[in-house]
Amino acid sequence: MAEVMLPRKMEILNHSSKFGSPDPLHVLAVDDSHVDRKFIERLLRVSSCKVTVVDSATRALQYLGLDVEEKSVGFEDLKVNLIMTDYSMPGMTGYELLKKIKESSAFREVPVVIMSSENILPRIDRCLEEGAEDFLLKPVKLSDVKRLRDSLMKVEDLSFTKSIQKRELETENVYPVHSQLKRAKI
C-alpha cells in the first residue's frame, strides 16, 4: 500500500536541497583591500558559492542588519552560511566584527573565518577562542575554500537531517494513528 504523505512532511521535502536543485552556499566576504576582495570573491565563485562582498566591518554589520544607525536588510530574509573577514581593517577589525556577530542571536551560529597575512599566534588564538571557525593565512588558496565549503555542506546536511527527524517526531505526536499505521505498514 502507498505511504500517505502528510502536508508537513511534503513541505520539508520541497525545501530540501537533496530533492531539488541545491542552493549555493552564501558567503559574506569582508576585506578593505580591493585586490583581496576580488581574489576571495573569485575563489568562492569558482567553488560554486554565492558571494556578497563588502569593504569594511561596518558595511558587513549594515548588510546583516546589525548596525545601530540604519538597518539595510531585514535578517529574517537573509541567509548567510559563512562570513569570511580580514583581520586588519581600518575602523573595526575582523576580531571586533567576529565578537559582534557572536553576540547576535540571529547570526551567532553562522561560522566566521578570519583571514590575515600576519601569522601572529596570540591573535589567532584569541579569534579561535572568541568563536572563529578557522583562521586562514593570506593568500587564501582554493583548497582552503573547498575545505570550508565541504565542511559547511556536511553541517548543513546534518542540520537538515535533524530538522526532518524533529518534524517526524512532531508528526508522530500530532498524528499518532498515522504513526501506528506506518509502523504496521497497513
Curated annotation (Swiss-Prot):
At which residues is 4-aspartylphosphate found? 86
Q: Name one Pfam family in it.
A: Response_reg
Q: Any idea which UniProt keywords this protein has?
A: Cytokinin signaling pathway, Nucleus, Phosphoprotein, Transcription, Transcription regulation, Two-component regulatory system
- Which InterPro entries has this protein been placed in? ARR-like (IPR045279), CheY-like_superfamily (IPR011006), Sig_transdc_resp-reg_receiver (IPR001789)
Induction: what does the entry report? By cytokinins (BA and zeatin) and nitrate.
What is the tissue specificity?
Predominantly expressed in roots.
Question: What GO molecular function terms would the record report?
Answer: phosphorelay response regulator activity
One GO cellular component this record assigns the protein to is: nucleus
Query: What positions does the domain Response regulatory occupy?
Result: 26-153
Location comes to: Nucleus
- Entry PTM: Two-component system major event consists of a His-to-Asp phosphorelay between a sensor histidine kinase (HK) and a response regulator (RR). In plants, the His-to-Asp phosphorelay involves an additional intermediate named Histidine-containing phosphotransfer protein (HPt). This multistep phosphorelay consists of a His-Asp-His-Asp sequential transfer of a phosphate group between first a His and an Asp of the HK protein, followed by the transfer to a conserved His of the HPt protein and finally the transfer to an Asp in the receiver domain of the RR protein.
GO terms in the biological process aspect are:
cytokinin-activated signaling pathway; regulation of DNA-templated transcription; response to cytokinin
Role noted for this protein: Functions as a response regulator involved in His-to-Asp phosphorelay signal transduction system. Phosphorylation of the Asp residue in the receiver domain activates the ability of the protein to promote the transcription of target genes. Type-A response regulators seem to act as negative regulators of the cytokinin signaling.
What protein am I looking at? Two-component response regulator ARR6
Q: Which organism is it from?
A: Arabidopsis thaliana
The gene it comes from is ARR6
